[in-house]
């Protein structure tokens, strides 16, 4: 299927294609267009619009487009629900929703700054979302506790 959204993706417009490709559509084609052209091109190209005002798969109150996709496609994986909270926090500037939201926001803005090609940015963003999903699903309780001070090392020495 073809999917279309606004160009220059940030948070939701990277998270949604990741969700679509991993759980909804095994062979998606993503199209990025200027916001003013998305609905028109969706009709012309028979593409499903998302994360654009006035379409089904978009923000609804405090929820973001990632939430809309989870609901429409009845995705009930608890790890996806947890990831949705992180995405929602980062995408709606509600960083209090999850401690990871601030990091996701920072990394997403960095990706957008580093890549001018939307599809290249998406490719790199998928790695990020694969890692976040793995954390939510399998390793959320793992910590990193290495402390060289406890091992008798002194950081002031070269």
Which functions belong to the PLM regions below?
Residues 1-8, 18-150, 154:
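Extended, well-folded catalytic/binding cores that form a central cleft or groove in large enzyme
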